[in-house]
Curated annotation (Swiss-Prot):
This is Isoaspartyl peptidase. The active site is at 179 (nucleophile). Substrate binds at residues 207-210, 230-233. The gene is iaaA. The lineage of its organism: Bacteria, Pseudomonadati, Pseudomonadota, Gammaproteobacteria, Enterobacterales. Belongs to the Ntn-hydrolase family. It comes from the Bacteria.
Length: 313
């Protein structure tokens, strides 16, 4: 294969065709198509995989349809806490931020952590202050708010109270989460991955999922694969899902497709994990597996027509 390629996702979960209007479908497909086409053009122009995934996730953060940046979900306290990670498969350098509320684009803050600090992961106020010191503007958390996300919070609160009072059953996690991500292989053979999220609706303040954790929700290594995950974050952390794909390929000799099948369809469900991931290997092969009802996704090789999807086809 050995071609430049990009894949993106806008989250996985209980995305039922029957609950989606044709107009809603078109909005998601258009947004995914425009963003992946932008990445394809960058790859054609010779941009690095790292720059391509960073820009793709920045655009996803700017789109209110997805749970990252503008349109991020609310915590139980009615606040926003955002997480992001980037990783360069060529150098194995990575940067991440978690629990930030005053940075418009967490993925750009994560990139700054990687390139301008000696650290990999920074959290909360310290991460924000570092980003501000590097020239990022401080923004009001209100910019992330949308009416649809607030309605989700109210519904989750009501369901949570009812479950707590009567059945003790947890909320359906697949309906509360979402993430965005991108993986790419550039024409020089370098891989990169980026992931960003607002977390879970009605999550406890301070909760951090897999998205900003290297090896759990985001991983890239030129020797094997670039991966960005979406789903039940706690299970992705416990299984080191993103790194597990790389390990199965590098040490177990599995193909990209077989490694993804093992992790997404076997290991994650065994622990109650729902969701999916996008991955591209060192040869440019692409995989977009998910075990949930749907996953917003798109991918395309440089110079080709992109492919988009929402449901299990």
């Amino acid at each position: 294969m050995n071609k430049a390629v990009i894949a993106i996702h806008g989250g996985a979960g209980a995305i039922a065709r029957a609950q989606m209007s044709h107009e809603q479908e078109l909005r998601y497909i258009q947004a995914l198509s425009e963003i992946v086409e932008s990445g394809q053009k960058m790859l054609e122009a010779g941009d690095s995989a790292l720059d391509v995934v960073t820009e793709a996730v920045r655009l996803l953060e700017a789109c209110p349809l997805f749970n990252a940046g503008i349109g991020a979900v609310y915590t139980r306290d009615g606040t926003h806490e955002l997480d992001a990670c980037v990783m360069d498969g060529n150098t194995l350098k990575a940067g991440a931020v978690a629990g930030v509320s005053h940075v418009r684009h967490p993925v750009l803050a994560a990139r700054l952590v990687m390139e301008r600090s000696p650290h990999v992961l920074m959290v909360g106020e310290g991460a924000e202050n570092f980003a501000f010191s590097q020239g990022m503007a401080r923004v009001s958390p209100d910019i992330f708010s949308t009416p649809a996300r607030y309605e989700q919070l109210l519904a989750a609160r009501a369901a949570g109270e009812m479950a707590l009072d009567h059945s003790g059953a947890p909320l359906d996690e697949t309906k509360k989460m979402g993430t965005v991500g991108a993986v790419a292989r550039d024409k020089f053979g370098n891989l990169a991955a980026a992931t960003s999220t607002g977390g879970m609706t009605n999550k406890l303040p301070g909760r951090v999922g897999d998205s900003p954790l290297v090896g759990a929700g985001c991983y890239a290594n030129n020797a094997s694969v670039a991966v960005s995950c979406t789903g039940t974050g706690e299970v992705f952390i416990r299984t080191l899902a993103a790194y597990d794909i790389a390990a199965l390929m590098e040490y177990g000799g599995l193909s990209l497709a077989d490694a993804c099948e093992r992790v997404v369809m076997e290991k994650l469900p065994a622990l109650g994990g729902s969701g999916g991931l996008i991955a591209v290997d060192h040869e440019g092969n692409v995989a977009l597996p998910f075990n949930s009802e749907g996953m917003y996704r798109a991918w395309g090789y440089a110079g080709d027509t992109p492919t988009t999807g929402i449901y299990r086809e």
